[in-house]
């Protein structure tokens, strides 16, 4: 690909990352502070830059970098991969432009993530899919994962950090509430994108649901069965069936909200998911499960209590930690660290204590 084409692609990508139309980009460039050398640009010129018809001048790229809050170097590095084949889940309709924004943001973040791992000499862990022939295979895979990752039978303290420690890249993104999660395999590496704004219990479940999409070969199943198996996988990794049954018993007529709260605090799984699991394992009857849902949908106070989040929030700082580790080991400069963090020199310098 010639340079003007990928520069154009990166300009378009930067605009999409911000969620701007060409009109919005034009207006922002036109209203830049007077202290910044301003190059007047028409909407038509911007369109030609994005399509690779014309190569922008150095001053123009400086202006674009300013409004996008990106280093000029961003425009000269073509993306090494795409997320065109990513599978995503959403609760309701989400705009195509928002989905594209999420994909491009993820691409840009992953480029920086892979780069710092390469600098630190960290080998990538390629994904090996497991063929699922029946529901039993989902239980077995979840059990094997817990064993392979040395999780024991206790709750997972931080799902995102645990996944990243085992080679899965997890990207949190600020987006609309209709977006649940997305998963992809990039150069053999598992990538998961989740909604940053969700409650901890929902983020944990969604991340593991997406991991199910990555680890399980479910090509022979329809969408409904695929989603069911990924939900089962997430539930089993969070709280294994044997542990769940040992705590609740084989058969129950009722389960108290107090008991649900206790398990929720230990395993970081929502009360709704716990009740569903109790029904799935035949601990409660279908009648009691229906009653629970009817009460929740008709009693606002009960619904609020059931859906209340009580688990600590979680995220991962692995990428940031690797950058500062490389900086303190003299593997990179402060300016390179700022680039890899998509930050500025002052922020990087302020975080260097010794």
Regions found by a protein language model. Name each.
Residues 1-354:
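Active-site hotspot residues in diverse enzymes, especially metal/ion-binding acidic/histidine motifs
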């Amino acid at each position: 690909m010639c340079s003007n084409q990928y520069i154009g692609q990166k300009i378009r990508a930067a605009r999409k990352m911000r969620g701007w139309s060409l009109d919005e980009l034009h207006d922002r460039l036109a209203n830049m502070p007077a202290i910044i050398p301003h190059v007047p640009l028409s909407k038509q010129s911007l369109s030609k830059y994005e399509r690779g018809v014309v190569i922008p001048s150095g001053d123009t790229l400086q202006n674009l970098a300013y409004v996008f809050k990106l280093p000029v170097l961003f425009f000269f590095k073509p993306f090494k991969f795409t997320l065109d084949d990513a599978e995503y889940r959403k609760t309701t309709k989400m705009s195509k432009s928002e989905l594209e924004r999420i994909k491009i943001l993820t691409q840009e973040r992953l480029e920086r993530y892979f780069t710092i791992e390469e600098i630190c000499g960290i080998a990538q862990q390629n994904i090996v899919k497991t063929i699922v022939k029946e529901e039993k295979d989902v239980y077995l895979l979840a059990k094997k994962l817990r064993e392979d990752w040395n999780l024991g039978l206790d709750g997972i303290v931080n799902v995102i950090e645990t996944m990243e420690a085992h080679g899965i890249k997890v990207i949190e993104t600020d987006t609309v509430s209709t977006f649940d999660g997305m998963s992809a395999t990039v150069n053999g590496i598992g990538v998961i994108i989740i909604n940053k704004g969700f409650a901890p219990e929902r983020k944990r479940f969604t991340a593991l649901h997406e991991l199910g999409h990555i680890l399980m070969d479910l090509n022979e199943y329809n969408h409904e069965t695929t989603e069911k198996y990924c939900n089962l996988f997430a539930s089993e990794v969070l709280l294994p069936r044997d542990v769940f049954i040992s705590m609740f018993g084989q058969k129950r007529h009722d389960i108290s909200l107090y008991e649900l709260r206790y398990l929720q605090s230990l395993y970081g799984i929502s009360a709704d998911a716990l009740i569903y699991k109790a029904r799935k394992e035949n601990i409660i009857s279908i009648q009691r499960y229906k009653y629970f849902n009817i009460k929740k949908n008709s009693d606002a106070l009960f619904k609020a209590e059931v859906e209340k989040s009580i688990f600590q929030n979680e995220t991962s700082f692995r990428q940031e930690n690797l950058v500062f580790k490389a900086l303190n080991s003299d593997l990179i400069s402060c300016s390179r660290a700022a680039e890899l963090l998509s930050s500025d020199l002052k922020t990087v310098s302020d975080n260097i204590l010794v």
